[in-house]
Amino acid sequence: MDQVIAELAATVARKSEEGLTATPMPNVGLYKVSRCIDLLPETYRPVVSLILQGEKQLSIGDEILIYRAGHTFTAALDLPVLGKITEASASRPYLAISLAIAS
C-alpha cells in the first residue's frame, strides 16, 4: 500500500499546481500545498479525500482529527471545520486527491 501511495503522490506532485487543480474527470481534484497553513474556517461539501503526503489537522467541534499519507477523510454532508496544514514544504508538499460527492 505504501508504494501505491508513493506513486500516486509522485503523479499528483507532477500534475498539479499550488492549491486545487481540476482534472478531466468530473468532481475529482488534486491538492498541492507547499507550506504550512494556520487555521482556516471552511465548509466541506460532501467529499472523499485521500491524503498522499504531508499532514492536515481538522477541528470539528471539540474533536481534533489528524490526517496523514494513506488516511482518508469522508464528509457525507456539508461540514463546517477549522483546517490547517501542519506538514508541508516546497520539497515535500501536502498532496491529496478529492472526489466530490453529488448531493
Residue ranges and their predicted role:
Residues 20-103:
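N-terminal regulatory/effector-sensing and dimerization cores
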Residues 1-18:
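Cyclic nucleotide-binding regulatory module and flanking cytosolic helices
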